[in-house]
Swiss-Prot record:
Residues 559-771 are annotated as: NBD2. Gene3D superfamilies: 1.10.8.60, Clp, N-terminal domain, P-loop containing nucleotide triphosphate hydrolases. This is Chaperone protein ClpB. GO terms for molecular function: ATP binding; ATP hydrolysis activity. ATP 1 binds at residues 205-212. PROSITE patterns: CLP_R, CLPAB_1, CLPAB_2. It comes from Staphylococcus aureus (strain N315). Pfam families: AAA, AAA_2, AAA_lid_9, Clp_N, ClpB_D2-small.
Length: 869
């Protein structure tokens, strides 16, 4: 017995047989140990052949185990188990060797062991019974005329079935979604496939535009016989490159597998069209020192026209991998696959609608499909149609499906209330005092009412679930009948096709309509139902909001109120700048109502005015009121961009420079939060060339970063602040606080000297902030003191400041050229510092109120007024 004349699978089975003998404490390797090991080998050919012959493999394996247990085990010291081979096992190998010679093979393979076992082993004979000829035929089919010339022959057996999937067969079985549209690309692919040489199309397009769908569409046309005569007998196999590479342990095994696949394709005489998705992976696949990569193995067959191949890859990967190998590139014909427009996407979604309804057991409204196409096109800018629209519909269906599977909120609340009352009831039953008895009686009455309510709701939910289940079942039956009709028409079974088309399908459609009408009549409007089974445009809007953070769903009442009173909310934080507040809040309202220009940002403003008048504060308060947090504001301090080259920090370093992979500060922030407030603070400090980047943001609502990706700014509010012209404003403002026309012109003159006209012309509005008046200061004092009280609240302390003291604080800190900041510092010195010293020195108890007054010497006095008990 020469182990080197056996395949790796047989060698592995013998090794496993030795281990089995050791487990059973047997000195000899019995025939059952070898056969059991062969059966349990990973990817066992022995097992695969028996399964295809419909033999109970598990029972056969158990029979081998039972037979092994009948052999006498040997106990003792220094006994070597599994060192010798039994007479019957030796006969098995000898007989297998004779089969090897009969098949003209070079190595003993698993099929030889199986043939030998069928002749020698009684257990195997018993289970195979009268299926000997069937197994011989299966072995012949599996081998496919190949000879065992290597120690890993299984690689060559049925290579296409192992490393690919038959798309035409999947279409026949109804496993594939229908392909709608893409007729021109499919026709182009068919034309290229019909050529004599270089008949290999490669589909090139962005991810998600439907490259794979075109090949699936071709497979569907082949099944429907809607192709030229030359393609009628063809089948399309999708090659699974990952399966081809996975588990290739030995050097050259990958090449061996690929050669086996190509050999099968070649021997089919052009009947098999090989589809390789992500074809760029072939370039370099399996490449090791001195080895040939997969791309080079394909070239000769492609050139001779022996291999019909369809490839699919993206533009970037085609350029990076295939264009570099010009010899491979010239063997393919390019078919450009462009992104479909919104109308085509809606048609595609309508075609897929029924399949998704049947799969999820829901009903999809047409307006949900329209919303999915339109909203995904508008808001999800980093992906492509129709993929992103299909994903939206699928996600919305899954959301409704999960809701249908769980209890409605109303019933859930009642269930929890009943459980709570039952626990309370069991506790009160153990009490004997009158108060507890009284409470128990009240509780039992409430529990009875809640249980009655629970039963009514449960009954309603069960009724709705039953009706929905009936609808789902009827839709599934209709889908199966339509699939059966297609099969009957394809197979020219006219009698069955007529029965389905004019009998079964109309009847099922009628029954489905009746069920839907009854459900509609009984349950009323969708809003009255306990369980929702309809996907509407609202669900689509909610999912777009989840994915992007952009609010596109319908306005709820609370948000409606917030938007209508947005200017009032902003006025509470920003004092004295009515025009600026109104302009910003109006822009937000326009955007949320859906009537803003879809190709520009929500708003772009330049705030001009002296320091400390509320320019930055307005941007912060807008972010806080829109997103409930100032953290959603993207703040960029333009004083950091004083050099011309600093613009690369906004959009990312160019290729070849350090930090190219990190992206830009502005572009990356907006990609993560497309709905945000962008504050470009102190713009006059930046280099003027930096603003050239803003041109396309302000006009087109997008910016291309250093990697060539387009970043969408259409859902941002851009606010720039500057102190340009602040001196003119301070000197020429009226006593009433109004800004005169001449002052405005003087400020604009200063502005034109700094900014280029094309930037100023693209802004929605240039807002002049007026210097703060003495009246404004008193309001700001109130605001600062409110914030101080919020901080003190954590220590259960409060502060009350008299009106005289507030007026004195505003008067003393009033410096028009510096705005509100001196007031903040003045309050820190006059109130916060003395208060902090008192707190550290005296340690106020919780509930203390400190009263601050102004004495006759114009000094502030601090009195501990009262302590709350």
């Amino acid at each position: 017995m020469d182990i080197n004349k056996m395949t790796y699978a047989v060698q592995s089975a013998l090794q496993q047989a030795v281990e089995l003998s050791q487990q059973h404490k047997l000195q000899n390797i019995e025939i059952e140990a070898i056969l059991s090991a062969a059966l349990n080998e990973s990817e066992s050919l022995y097992k695969s052949i028996l399964e295809r012959a419909n033999i109970e493999v598990d029972q056969l394996n158990k029979a081998y185990e039972d037979k092994l247990n009948t052999y006498a085990s040997v106990e003792g010291d220094n006994i070597q188990y599994g060192q010798y081979i039994s007479q019957q096992a030796n006969q098995l190998i000898t007989k297998a060797e004779s089969y090897m010679k009969e098949y003209e093979d070079e190595y003993i393979s698993m099929e030889h062991i199986l043939r030998s076992a069928m002749d020698i082993d009684q257990t195997t004979k018993h289970y195979i019974n009268n299926k000997v000829e069937v197994i011989k035929e299966i072995i012949k089919k599996v081998r496919g005329g190949n000879h065992v010339t290597s120690q890993n022959p299984e690689v060559n057996y049925e290579a296409l079935a192992k490393y690919g999937r038959d798309l035409v067969e999947e279409v026949r079985q109804g496993k594939m979604d229908p392909v709608i549209g893409r007729d021109e690309e499919i026709r182009n692919t068919i034309r290229i496939l019909s050529r004599k040489t270089k008949n290999n199309p490669v589909l090139i397009g962005e991810p998600g535009v439907g490259k794979t769908a075109i090949v699936e569409g071709l497979a569907q046309r082949i099944v429907k016989k809607d192709v030229p005569e030359s393609l009628l007998d063809k089948t399309v196999f999708e090659l699974d490159l990952s399966a081809l590479v996975a588990g290739a342990k030995y050097r050259g095994e990958f090449e061996e597998r690929l050669k086996a696949v190509l050999k099968e394709v070649k021997e089919s005489d052009g009947r098999i069209i090989l589809f390789i998705d992500e074809i760029h992976m072939l370039v370099g696949a399996g490449k090791t020192d001195g080895a040939m990569d997969a791309g080079n193995m394909l070239k000769p067959m492609l050139a001779r026209g022996e291999l019909h191949c369809i490839g699919a890859t993206t533009l970037n990967e085609y350029r990076e991998y295939i264009e570099k190998d010009s010899a491979l590139e010239r063997r393919f014909q390019k078919v450009a696959v462009s992104e479909p427009d919104v109308e085509d996407t809606i048609s595609i979604l309508r075609g897929l609608k029924e399949r998704y309804e049947v799969y999820h057991g829901v009903r999809i409204q047409d307006r949900a499909l329209v919303a999915a196409a339109e909203l995904s096109d508008r808001y999800i800018t980093d992906r492509f149609l129709p993929d992103k629209a299909i994903d939206l519909v699928d996600q919305a269906c899954a959301t409704i499906r999960t809701e249908m599977g769980s209890n409605p909120t109303e019933l859930d609340q009642v269930n929890r209330r009943v459980m709570q009352l039952e626990i309370e009831e069991s506790a009160l039953k153990n009490e004997s005092d009158n108060a507890s008895k009284q409470r128990l009686q009240e509780l039992q009455e409430e529990l009875a009412n809640e249980k009655e309510k629970q039963a009514a709701l449960q009954s309603r939910v069960e009724s709705e679930k039953e009706k929905i289940a009936n609808l789902q079942e009827k839709r599934a039956q209709l889908d199966e009948s339509r699939q059966a009709l297609e099969d009957a028409q394809t197979n020219n079974n006219l009698e069955k096709a007529a029965e389905l088309q004019y009998g079964t399908i109309p009847q099922l459609e009628k029954e489905l309509r009746e069920l839907e009408d009854n459900f509609q009549d009984e349950q009323g409007e969708d809003t009255d139902r306990m369980i929702r089974e309809v996907v509407t445009d609202e669900e689509i809007g909610d999912i777009v909001s989840q994915w992007t953070g952009i609010p596109v769903s319908k306005l709820v009442e609370t948000e409606r109120e917030k938007l209508l009173h947005l200017s009032d909310i902003l006025h509470k934080r920003v004092v004295g700048q009515d025009k600026a507040v109104d302009l910003v809040s109006d822009a937000v309202v326009r955007a949320r109502a859906g009537i803003k220009d879809p190709n520009r940002p929500i708003g772009s403003f330049l705030f001009l005015g002296p320091t400390g008048v509320g320019k930055t504060e307005l941007a912060k308060s807008l972010a806080a009121s829109l997103f409930d947090s100032e953290k959603h504001m993207i703040r960029i301090d333009m004083s950091e961009y004083m050099e011309k080259h600093a613009v690369s920090r906004l959009i990312g370093a160019p290729p070849g420079y350090i930090g190219h992979d990190e992206g830009g500060q502005l572009t990356e922030a907006v990609r993560r939060n497309p709905y945000s407030v962008i504050l470009l603070d102190e713009v006059e400090k930046a280099h003027t060339d930096v603003f050239n980047v803003l041109l396309q943001i302000l006009d087109e609502g997008r910016l291309t970063d250093s990697k060539g990706r387009s970043v969408d700014f259409k859902n941002t509010i851009i606010i720039m602040t500057s102190n340009i012209g602040s001196q003119v404003l301070l000197e020429n403002v009226k006593e009433t606080g109004e800004i005169t026309e001449s002052t405005e012109k003087a400020v604009m003159t200063n502005l034109n000297a700094y900014f280029k006209p094309e930037i100023l012309n693209r802004m929605d509005d240039i807002v002049l902030f007026k210097p703060l008046s003495i009246d404004d200061m008193s309001m700001i004092v109130d605001k600062i003191l409110t914030q101080l009280n919020i901080r003190l609240l954590e220590q259960r302390i409060s502060i009350e400041v008299s009106d005289d003291a507030k007026a004195w604080l505003g008067q003393e800190a009033y410096e028009p050229q510096y705005g509100a900041r001196p007031l903040k510092r003045f309050v820190q010195r006059q109130i916060e510092t003395p208060l902090a010293r008192m707190m550290i020195k005296e340690g106020f108890p919780e509930g203390t109120t400190i009263k601050v007054n102004l004495n006759s010497d114009n000094n502030l006095t601090f009195n501990v007024e009262k302590i709350h008990e």
